[in-house]
Amino acid sequence: MWSDPIADMLTRIRNANMVFKEYTDIPASNLKKKICEILKREGFIADYKYIEDGKQGILRVYLKYKGGRKNRERVIHGIVRVSHSGRRIYVDKDHIPKVKNGLGIAILTTSKGVLTDKEARQLGVGGEVIAYVW
């Protein structure tokens, strides 16, 4: 059986977001921390925190919503894994996708680290498309 830790992370965030949870816990890794940093910087999550558990650690991701308690709206409308173990999706600097005509972001792993589509365009690097978030 194959496992995809990044797809698991995105699914946990998507599921918690759908039921308006305050936070969700995810097994930690360096790549997941970098993805959380991008989501926080771009305003899709409120915050994240690393919790030491004696093993690999846990990332507690605090989700973000608009509005009050009664009329809450989700900030994350969609989060999708693009490249996975069975089908890797690589793009060069000239073919970096725009998500929802610029309203969302694409998260890429590049030679310069984990970047958004805008950052990768500015640096002129391509890479593997991890996920789309809008």
Swiss-Prot record:
Q: Which GO terms describe its cellular component?
A: ribonucleoprotein complex; ribosome
Recorded GO MF terms? rRNA binding; structural constituent of ribosome
Does the record's keyword annotation contain Membrane? no
Q: Which UniProt keywords apply?
A: Ribonucleoprotein, Ribosomal protein, RNA-binding, rRNA-binding
Q: Taxonomically, which superkingdom? A: Bacteria
Q: Which GO terms fall under biological process for this protein?
A: translation
Which PROSITE patterns does its entry note? RIBOSOMAL_S8
InterPro entries in the record: Ribosomal_uS8, Ribosomal_uS8_CS, Ribosomal_uS8_sf
Q: Would the keyword DNA repair turn up in this protein's UniProt record?
A: no
What PANTHER family is this protein classified in? 40S RIBOSOMAL PROTEIN S15A
HAMAP family referenced in this protein's UniProt entry, alphabetically: Ribosomal_uS8_B (MF_01302_B)
NCBIfam families reported for this sequence: PRK00136.1
Please explain the role this protein plays, according to its UniProt record. Answer: One of the primary rRNA binding proteins, it binds directly to 16S rRNA central domain where it helps coordinate assembly of the platform of the 30S subunit.
- Family, as annotated: Belongs to the universal ribosomal protein uS8 family.
**Quaternary state and partners of this protein?**
Part of the 30S ribosomal subunit. Contacts proteins S5 and S12.
Put simply, this protein is called: Small ribosomal subunit protein uS8
